[in-house]
Structure formats: C-alpha cells, structure tokens
Amino acid sequence: MSPAELHADSIVIDGLIIAKWNRELFEDMRKGGLTAANCTVSVWEGFQATVNNIVASNKLIRDNSDLVIPVRSTADIRKAKEQGKTGILYGFQNAHAFEDQIGYVEVFKQLGVGIVQMCYNTQNLVGTGCYERDGGLSGFGREIVAEMNRVGIMCDLSHVGSKTSEEVILESKKPVCYSHCLPSGLKEHPRNKSDEELKFIADHGGFVGVTMFTPFLKKGIDSTIDDYAEAIEYVMNIVGEDAIGIGTDFTQGHGHDFFEWLTHDKGYARRLTNFGKIVNPLGIR
C-alpha cells in the first residue's frame, strides 16, 4: 500500500484546529482527506459568548452539509469517513466558559462539545496555564474534572502548567491529552512539554498531538516539513506509536487582531507572548 493509499484508507483526525471557519476551509479539509477535527469554539469567551459561537457554528455546518457533519460520537466519525466528509467536534481551549457553574459542563456536552482545555496560558478557576506560576488544580477544578469525566468531555492540557497538568492526569478517571504541543527537548518554550511530561501522560493512558505551529518548532518561522517530522519522531520515541497523533493548530484565515486577542490575558489585558510572523512550515499551505 502506497502512502497515498494508506492516507485515503485511514481515519485521519486533527487534534486541534483554530482556523477561521468558512466554506473554503471545509473544502481544504475534504481535499486533504481529513476525517474529523477538534475545532475551537471558545478561548477567552464566557458562557453566553461561547453559546453564541456554537449557534453560529451550527448554522455554518448546516449551510455546508455537503462537506461537513457534526460529531457527537465515534459513530459520527465513522459516518464522516463513509460519506467522504469531515466531522466537526466542538472544543474549548479554556474552561473559562464554565464560569463558576459545574452544571454548565453538561450543558455544553449537550451542545456538542467533546473536549475542553483546562486553562489557556493563565490562571482560571480550574487551575493554572503555562505562562504563570503554577498553583496546581483547584478544588473547584477537581469537581470540573469529575463532571467532565461523567458526561464524556475530554480534558486537554496543551496550554496548561506542569503542576496543574500532572494533577489533572492523576485526578481524571479517563484518559486526557495534550491535543497540540511540541517537545521542549527540541526547543525550550513555555508552551512545549518536557520529556518527563510527555512520558507521564503516555504512561497514564493519555494522547499527545504534535503541532506544526512554527513559533514552537526548533527553527521557528524557518521550519520546514522535515522539522515537523523530526518533532513527531522525537515525541514518538518517548510516548510510543499508540499515544501519538497530530494536532496541527492551524490558524488559516485569521489576521493580526485575532493573534493580538489570543496573546493577551483574557483577550485584552497584559501581553503573554508575541508570536511575530505566523506561517506554516515550508511546504504546507
């Protein structure tokens, strides 16, 4: 079987996409043979703004039903493969949308959310992100983890601090993930994960999605597909082939204002980082 045949035969899932949703993007997903993806619908937004995002996303999926379908279960992913479409799984990059209401976890599950990152770079009511001194998982956070386990929402730790991540891994009764990360063994960066962190999540049944977001790759914006492949190989040698996948963190369609919003705490406060120029690795559109 050739690489192209293997790709065509496989169920291909992207661990995270935060691109601007439109028909052109959905067409690219079909051309690329993408079966399903974790698609971000909340970062800094609270409850109501996140519901509004989901309402808009639902309409976009309906209007492009020849290309995409909503994902509520693994059966929907298989259905997407059979129909030659891409399954859209809603995900959060921050538990901020739960506010201080444990009951909101189930509400969002019923709205189609299947994965939630516990923190986005900074402190919230659940725990601490990777750009702050890490105080660990809060008592409220433990209740949120338990409720996410109960209703079937996966805990994502990609932007989460090391101590909070470890405590979520130990607290969760179900597997958790780094949906989109890179190894600090190739480049030191607050967003990258150490060899020990990668091994710990894999040893506890978790999953690691390797991102191609160039600011975190070894050569930055000068990175190529070869550099991305090197990162995949590096992580696989630590976690094993059964615990590794891809989480591209694609951002197609977004402009300067979007990245300014992402890189300031709560979307407007202190600057957390400056990505500079955002490009995909050479060879990827």
Task: Mark where each language-model region is.
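A generic "binding-loop/recognition-motif" signal
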Residues: 122, 160-161
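Histidine- and/or cysteine-centered catalytic micro-motif in compact active-site loops
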Residues: 160, 181-183, 211-215
